[in-house]
Amino acid sequence: MKLIPAIDLMNGKCVRLFKGDFNKRKDFSRKPYEQAKYWEEQGAKCIHIVDLDAAKSGYPSNDQSIKKIAKEVNIPIQIGGGIRSLERIEQLFSYGVDKVIMGTSAIENKELVKNLSTKFPRRIIIGIDAKDGKVSTRGWIEQSDVLATDLVKEFSKFEIASFIVTDINTDGTLEGTNEVFIKKILEITDIPVIASGGVGAISDLLSLTKFEHLGLCGVIVGKALYENKFKISEANNILSPERLQDIPINKDYFA
C-alpha cells in the first residue's frame, strides 16, 4: 500500500478544493512541476494529477504543466480530468504519463473503457467519485442516480489497473476517510483499489492499513501534505510492507 500525493491543476496553478466545490478553492505557491519534484524528493513513489479545468469543461488547458511534470520527475504519474477519447489518452502517454484516469467518459461510454482496457491493459484507471453512494460527473458538478457499487461491479470485468474511489463529502475536509464506503467497494471487486478523500492525519493512514488484505493498494493525499499535517517519509513508514506492526483486525467489524 502506498501514499500518492495529489496535484490538482487549475489555470496553471496547484489548488485544492473543499468537497469538490470550485468556489471553495485554495491556491498554493509552488509551480506544479516544482511541487511534483518536491514530492519526489520527499519520497513519493507516484504522483496523482487532476486537470480540474479539463474535468469541468472537457478541454485540456494544463498540458504545459503536465508535460513539464512528466519530464522533471522520475516516478510514475497518473492523470485524470477531461479524458474522454483515445486520441487524448495517446497524447498523454506520449508525454510520459504512466496511467490515465477515466471518470465521466467511463460512465457515459462503457464500450470505450472496454476497448481501451484491451488496447492499454492495466494502464487505465477508473475514477469513481461519489456523494452519498451515487456517482458525480464533470468535475463533480453533475450528480447522477448511478450507484458507485454498480459501476465497480461492471468495470471489474475489464483489464483495468485499479479503481480510485473518492468520497466527495470528505474530500478536502481533513476529517478522516469514509471507511464504510471504502470497505463496501473492496468487498465487491478483485481489482486493486485506491482510496481518496478526507485524510487529515497520520492516524487516518494507519487506520486504512486494515483494508490492505482486501485489496486497498494506495491512498491519495492532497491537503494534509500541503498543510504539513505529516511528512511523506512518515506515511511511507506507516504504509510500508516492512512496518513493525499491522493494525489489529476487529473481527466484528469485518463480520
UniProtKB/Swiss-Prot annotation:
Identify the Pfam families for this entry.
His_biosynth (PF00977)
Q: Which UniProt keywords apply?
A: Amino-acid biosynthesis, Cytoplasm, Histidine biosynthesis, Isomerase
The record ties this protein, via InterPro entries, to: Aldolase_TIM, His_biosynth, HisA_bact_arch, Isoase_HisA-like, Isoase_HisA-like_bact, RibuloseP-bd_barrel
Q: Write down the EC number.
A: 5.3.1.16
The subcellular location is:
Cytoplasm
Q: Which CDD domains match?
A: HisA
What is catalyzed by this enzyme? 1-(5-phospho-beta-D-ribosyl)-5-[(5-phospho-beta-D-ribosylamino)methylideneamino]imidazole-4-carboxamide = 5-[(5-phospho-1-deoxy-D-ribulos-1-ylimino)methylamino]-1-(5-phospho-beta-D-ribosyl)imidazole-4-carboxamide
Q: Name one GO molecular function term.
A: 1-(5-phosphoribosyl)-5-[(5-phosphoribosylamino)methylideneamino]imidazole-4-carboxamide isomerase activity
Q: What class of enzyme is it?
A: isomerase
Q: Which residues cross the membrane?
A: none
What Gene3D superfamilies has UniProt attached to this entry?
Aldolase class I
Task: Identify which residues the record assigns to the active site.
Answer: 8 (proton acceptor), 129 (proton donor)
Q: Name one GO biological process term.
A: L-tryptophan biosynthetic process
Give the pathway listed in the UniProt entry for this protein. Amino-acid biosynthesis; L-histidine biosynthesis; L-histidine from 5-phospho-alpha-D-ribose 1-diphosphate: step 4/9
Naming one, the record's GO cellular component terms include:
cytoplasm
The family annotation for this protein states:
Belongs to the HisA/HisF family.
| Protein name according to UniProt | 1-(5-phosphoribosyl)-5-[(5-phosphoribosylamino)methylideneamino] imidazole-4-carboxamide isomerase
